[in-house]
Amino acid sequence: MNEIFFLIFAFLTIYLSIKLSIYADNLSKTSTISKAVIGGLLLAGVTALPELITCTSSILLKNPLLSLGNILGSNLFNIFITALLDIIFIKKIYTTKTTKTNYLTYLILIINYLVIYMFIQEKINITILNIGLPTIIIIILYFIYIKLLPKNKEEQIQIDLKPIKNIKGKLLITSILMIASSVLLTTFVNNIAQSHPSFSSGSIGAILLGITTSLPEVITFYTLISIDNYDLALQDIVGSNLFNLAILSFADIIYKTSPIYNIIDNNTTTILFLGLIFIIISFLQNIRTKCISKVTYIIPSIIIVSLYLYFWLIGFI
């Protein structure tokens, strides 16, 4: 029965997330802020709302490992989808160059992942009031990221969307429904995890919550690529990943028992490590100025897709 309710609220959460993204796009259409701010903050924040609610709910349900799996699994899935769509849309993306704003986001992501990995490996073990060092670094770097985002009005998003009446009211109502749906979704996933003790809560969180809550980002990414706006699409994905880590730091703060990173298990550690590798590969792929051919361009994407499928289909199952 838990599985049926999970599917119901998973579809509802995805639907509400899509609606939120549409409303955010319409709201940004009349805005004078830059593409980087809209992609890195507005779209990333709106599409990451399910992660925020499900992550917080996991802590309140006293299953912090579910929260870790959710965030790390979501980030892993995001990069996997980026690589997969790189392959599918190779003709559109091959000649596209990304901005330096994306480089900044990638670098901050890599630093955050390295700090978390070193912390759980006990290379650095600094805590303040039961809050882990990674949380402090994530928060500081996120504020630096916001500060450094270009806020000029020159670079505007041009997305052909029909104006929506009373958009702010609809955005608010949809957000409230999203919160309720995400809480119930997390509750049923937690029940599934409790009824399957042979599986890690982190892995279940990564699969059921991580992938479900990431689908809005995937849809946004696909839509932006289809209208030849790869730079904004990439900014949305890496910006969402960065925002997800900020959510994880919030979870660490409200999880008062110990740093949340201390309860990570082997499966979740593997997800973290794969996430770090994927982000580095994706970063190196996007900073290249020249490629000999489409084949050499697409090799990193093939590596990411292959590793992801191997981990879930062979390594885990």
Regions found by a protein language model. Give the residues of each.
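Hydrophobic alpha-helical segments, chiefly the membrane-spanning helices
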Residues: 1-317
